């Protein structure tokens, strides 16, 4: 990546001031010593990656931040060495297994809560990957592996990202679905969450913001295999084109500073038995849009058609047709 202008680089002191002000503005907790530990442990990742803010519409929820890494690094070991993660955590084996796939190609990034420290380890698998590869690693219990058939039945056969939530012992698995997403497919995917179907106007809005081939994240309990949530994402939504958003999200997008080359706002509609809410992310430094574009993510206003995905679907359909 070319050198960024000085005002767009990650600066630890400026970040400390910005995180204090943003947390105060949205009523989120903050632990300053934990923040210092994170910044020291992952200094290179913040300096060379892209940093973003995150929160949800839930009152008092955490102000979170993430680096999308440009460095190939074992961030889990670094978190353990810094005292941010327990070396005996029961889900370490899952991250190890996923990180070793495809000759060790997956890239690890880190999510942190301002008030609690290490939150998630995020993995980009290097492109479209068969869901079978991701969801049948031996480190996953049979209850989780058994979910594969449910996803394949919905046409969710390819995964691009996953994130392990250390605190909740769960994982978000990010599928790219062949679209366009319609009300029938939305309802089928939403039913996995077990939550009450949303109002028609909510569904209409979600569909209006989805690219043709869409991203849906499914949250799995890593012990029971229960599906806890489903979330649909819209990326790089300009402020003048935002959907209807809750007051807390509007406040967050107003006050969270972005020193990035391009402003990149992400909206997620999350549905689950414990309640529905809206997520938001906002670029901070490091050219978040460049990283996401390099990972073939689709932005608001783009056609969003994944030709590789469609070729894979066509091959699968022709193979199944020939087997009849």
Curated annotation (Swiss-Prot):
- Swiss-Prot/TrEMBL catalytic activity: 3-(4-hydroxyphenyl)pyruvate + dimethylallyl diphosphate = 3-dimethylallyl-4-hydroxyphenylpyruvate + diphosphate
This protein's pathway:
Antibiotic biosynthesis
Q: What happens when the gene is disrupted?
A: Cells lacking this gene produce antibiotic compounds (vanillobiocin, isovanillobiocin and declovanillobiocin) with a methoxy instead of the dimethylallyl group at the position 3 of the 4-hydroxybenzoic acid moiety of clorobiocin.
Keywords of the record, alphabetical order, are: Antibiotic biosynthesis, Prenyltransferase, Transferase
Question: Where does the signal sequence lie?
Answer: none
- Enzymatic class: transferase
Q: Which GO terms describe its biological process?
A: antibiotic biosynthetic process
Task: Report the EC code(s) recorded for this entry.
Answer: 2.5.1.111
User: Which of this chain's residues are annotated to bind substrate?
Assistant: 160, 281
What result is annotated for mutating residue 54 to S? Abolishes prenyltransferase activity
Looking up Pfam families in the UniProt record yields: PTase_Orf2
Query: Has UniProt tagged this entry with the keyword Methyltransferase?
Result: no
Q: Which GO terms describe its molecular function?
A: prenyltransferase activity; transferase activity, transferring alkyl or aryl (other than methyl) groups
Tell me how this protein assembles.
Monomer.
Q: Which family does it belong to?
A: Belongs to the aromatic prenyltransferase family.
Report the protein name in the record.
4-hydroxyphenylpyruvate 3-dimethylallyltransferase
Lineage, highest ranks first = Bacteria, Bacillati, Actinomycetota, Actinomycetes, Kitasatosporales
């Amino acid at each position: 990546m070319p050198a960024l202008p000085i005002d767009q680089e990650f600066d630890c002191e400026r970040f400390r001031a910005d995180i204090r002000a943003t947390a105060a503005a949205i009523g989120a907790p903050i632990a300053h010593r934990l923040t210092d530990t994170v910044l020291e442990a992952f200094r290179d990742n913040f300096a060379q990656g892209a940093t973003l803010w995150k929160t949800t519409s839930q009152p008092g929820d955490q102000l979170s931040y993430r680096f999308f890494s440009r460095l190939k690094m074992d961030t889990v070991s670094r978190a353990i060495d810094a005292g941010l993660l327990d070396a005996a955590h029961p889900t370490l084996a899952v991250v190890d297994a996923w990180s070793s796939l495809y000759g060790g190609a997956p890239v690890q990034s880190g999510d942190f809560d301002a008030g609690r420290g290490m939150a998630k380890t995020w993995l980009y698998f290097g492109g479209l990957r068969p869901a079978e590869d991701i969801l049948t690693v031996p480190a996953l219990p049979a209850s989780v592996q058994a979910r594969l058939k449910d996803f394949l039945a919905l046409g969710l056969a390819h995964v691009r990202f996953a994130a392990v939530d250390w605190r909740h012992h769960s994982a978000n698995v990010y599928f790219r679905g062949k679209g366009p997403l319609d009300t029938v497919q939305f309802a089928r995917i939403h039913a996995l969450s077990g939550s009450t179907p949303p109002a028609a106007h909510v569904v209409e809005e979600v569909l209006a913001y989805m690219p043709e081939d869409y991203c849906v994240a499914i949250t799995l309990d890593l012990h029971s295999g229960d599906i806890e949530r489903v979330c649909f994402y819209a990326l790089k939504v300009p402020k003048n084109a935002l959907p209807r958003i809750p007051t807390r999200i509007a406040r967050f997008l107003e006050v969270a500073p972005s020193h990035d080359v391009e402003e990149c706002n992400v909206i997620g509609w999350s549905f689950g038995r414990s309640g529905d809410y809206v997520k938001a992310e906002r670029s901070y430094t490091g050219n978040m849009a460049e990283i996401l574009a390099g990972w073939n993510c689709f932005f608001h206003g783009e056609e969003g058609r994944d030709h590789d995905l469609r070729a894979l679907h066509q091959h699968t359909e022709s193979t199944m047709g020939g087997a009849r």
